[in-house]
From Swiss-Prot:
Responsible for the formation of the 5-hydroxycytidine modification at the C2501 position (ho5C2501) of 23S rRNA. May be a Fe-S protein that catalyzes ho5C2501 formation using prephenate as a hydroxyl group donor. Changing H165A: No change in activity. Keywords: rRNA processing. The gene is rlhA. The keyword Cell membrane does not apply. This is 23S rRNA 5-hydroxycytidine C2501 synthase. Changing C611A: Loss of activity. Belongs to the peptidase U32 family.
């Protein structure tokens, strides 16, 4: 079911069902979560039972559950994937997020399909094709700007989904093979080794060092807080938070932050609405800077910028909180701009390395002065000089608020009590317009104190604290002020609320798979390289069906044995270090975008620069020992080493 043109969907990540529930309570309109297998986060899977229990919880708030099945599949995995999709459909999930086009060739139920960010959707032509072959919602590449997003929105009827917060893959999603080339672990199969977070030395074409031992492929975190209104105007309707590995506190905090931001826009503009039901109240002040982040960037949404990288450290250093005045044997004295608390996480940067410690005890020694005793005193602290900057990456008191009940979400209900002395008629109508009527037979005489009786009825009917509802309006339409015992009224109200629960769940309509356009679309290319990630026969059949003539195998098939782009990225190190020919002026205008090198230990990667689309290609070669490994996902690859030994021929004699 596509998001209505005026409804905005806040889409939150969930590592598990418990986090998914909290995401919904903190304001998510939809949650994406891994199933028992084939999701692009290797250690974020959930059982069918957990998902089946999560679905009705979400649907009671009008929220949706999307399950990620967004790895590329080996032929051996197609049948298990087909069974899993059928099982997921039976649990009631709203949609699958997929990358592998082979899934569209399987015999699966009519479940709604969303195109994963791994599909690398950057062009109008590709977006329109995916919409026309049956995808209801498409996740655009993070690297797009507002004009590109708007053009795609105007050319397709698919709901536009866009990442607004969280970690950034330096490569175009689905176009990174460096992990598989170096370790055999495939990002396209949910097992990225995160080579982009390692330190590298950058050398020019003469071998001269441009930058030494910095995290040159590590990006700051995405933060589109300031661009939400512009993204809405460009056509984005699903606002996605990255983070299926993130903990409960992170998801609570970031979901609450964007819930408040979107609600403010909805209230201000009047022509927009949230995509699910209820109002959300938070019992803490959200802050994007108090949970994990590597610094913030809005990436390419407005224009290319030079400060998108987190080159010094891929770790979370938090917010500046003061400076170190003195370091003693077992403690340090600090001057701060904010109060400290026992349990705070503090750190300093020493030669670009984060030296962190937990404050076991803090003691105020003067105005804005504290003495801090760490749990363990890092030896490197003794290297720093007075007035060294101090950061806090764990605010203990703020975090404690998140470990408790930190949000409440309730759905509005209009209540009307009618009837007469022999029968009461109670009607509950939810904010979505679902209505139930419940009756209570008896003999209800007129009360001695009419005003008190009417107030008791109104107050009693509005007591919805143990439910997910709140009374938006209470109307009493009786022939007089009738006396109804509190015990009867409470039971009457509880039964009606249960009936409304059931009616709202019964009325929930989930979407279904979108039909293929007529006439059938044609894929915009006739030749697909390994970059298309075609890893199984069904995916080949899909692309052949839509006009592709020549299809190369996915990188994981080990047919690309030479040097190829193992990463394609919009991030450009020439631009970052003011070596871009497009930016050159005066005497250096003759610069050319000659290749450069990234060096990490024995690993040497060549950088080539394609200046027309403004991209950097990281060139590498798959290691020989990986070529000898079984193909990922194959039956052979799933056999344990002990089992493989059993298959060896027995020695004679």
């Amino acid at each position: 079911m596509t998001v209505s043109s005026h409804r905005l969907e806040l889409l939150s990540p969930a590592r598990d069902a418990a986090i998914a529930r909290e995401a919904i309570l903190h304001g998510a309109d939809a949650v994406y979560i891994g199933g028992p297998g084939f999701g692009a986060r290797h250690n974020a899977s959930n059982s069918l039972k957990d998902i089946a229990e999560l679905v009705p919880f979400a649907h009671r708030y009008g929220a949706k559950i999307f399950v990620t099945l967004n790895t590329i599949l080996h032929d051996d995995e197609l049948e298990p994937a087909q069974r899993l999709i059928t099982d997921l459909y039976q649990t009631g999930v709203d949609a699958l997020i997929v990358q592998d086009m082979g899934i569209l060739e399987l015999d699966i139920p009519p479940i709604e399909l969303h195109a994963s960010t791994q599909c690398d959707i950057r062009t109008v032509e590709k977006a329109k094709f995916l919409s026309d072959v049956g995808f209801t919602q498409i996740v655009l590449a993070r690297e797009l700007n507002l004009d590109q997003i708007r053009a795609i929105h105007q050319a397709t009827d698919a709901t536009i989904e866009f990442f607004i917060h969280g970690a950034l893959c330096v490569a175009y999603s689905g176009q990174c093979y460096i992990s598989h080339a170096q370790t055999g672990r495939s990002a396209n199969r949910g097992d990225c080794s995160q080579a982009c977070r390692l330190p590298y030395t950058l050398k020019d074409d003469q071998g001269r060092v441009v930058s030494y031992e910095k995290h040159l492929l590590s990006m700051k975190d995405n933060d589109q807080t300031a661009n939400l209104g512009a993204l809405i105007d460009a056509g984005v309707r699903s606002f996605k938070i990255e983070g299926r590995y993130k903990d409960m506190s992170y998801v609570k905090n970031i979901t609450a932050h964007y819930r408040q931001m979107l609600d403010a826009i909805i209230e201000e503009r009047g022509d927009l609405a949230r995509a699910s039901s209820g109002r959300t109240e938070h019992f803490f002040v959200p802050s994007t800077e108090k949970t994990f982040h590597r610094g913030s960037t809005d990436y390419f949404v407005n224009a290319r910028k030079g400060d998108i990288g987190a080159f010094d450290s891929p770790k979370f250093i938090g917010l500046p909180v003061g400076e170190v005045v003195k370091v003693a044997k077992d403690h340090l004295d600090v001057a701060v701009t904010e109060p400290l608390a026992n349990g705070d996480g503090l750190n300093v940067l020493i030669k670009r390395e984060v030296v962190g410690f937990r404050a076991n005890t803090v003691e105020k020694t003067g105005e804005n002065q504290y003495r801090v005793w760490p749990n363990e005193m890092p030896a490197d602290l003794h290297k720093i000089r007075p007035h060294h900057p101090l950061n806090r990456n764990l605010d203990h008191n703020w975090q404690q608020a998140l470990t408790k009940t930190s949000s409440e979400r309730r759905v509005a209900v209009d209540i009307e009590l009618g009837g007469w002395q022999e029968q009461l008629i109670l009607t509950l109508t939810s904010e979505e317009g679902v209505s139930i009527t419940h009756t209570l037979d008896g003999q209800f005489d007129e009360a001695n104190n009419a005003e008190k009786a009417m107030n008791n009825l109104k107050d009693g009917l509005a007591k919805l604290g143990q439910t997910l509802y709140y009374a938006r309006d209470v109307q009493i339409n009786l022939p007089g002020a009738l006396f109804v015992p509190n015990s009867l009224l409470n039971q009457f109200r509880r039964e009606a609320a249960d009936m409304l629960d059931a009616a709202r769940l019964a009325s929930y309509q989930r979407g279904s798979r979108k039909p293929v356009a007529d006439p059938a679309p044609v894929y915009p290319q006739t030749h697909l390289s390994f970059l298309a990630n075609v890893y199984n026969q069904k995916a080949r059949e899909f692309y052949h069906r839509y006009g592709v003539q020549l299809i190369d195998a996915a990188y994981e098939a080990h047919e690309e044995k030479g040097e190829v782009p193992v990463m394609i990225t919009k991030h450009c190190l020439r631009f970052a270090f003011n070596l871009c020919p497009k930016q050159a002026k005066g005497n250096i205008k003759s610069w050319k975008a000659t290749p450069m090198q990234l060096v990490n230990g024995d690993e040497v990667l060549t950088l080539k620069f394609d200046c027309r689309p403004c991209e950097m290609h990281v060139i590498g070669k798959i290691k020989n020992h990986i070529l000898k490994m079984p193909l990922p996902g194959s039956v052979v690859a799933s056999v344990s080493p002990d089992e493989l030994l059993k298959t060896l021929p027995k020695r004679k004699g």
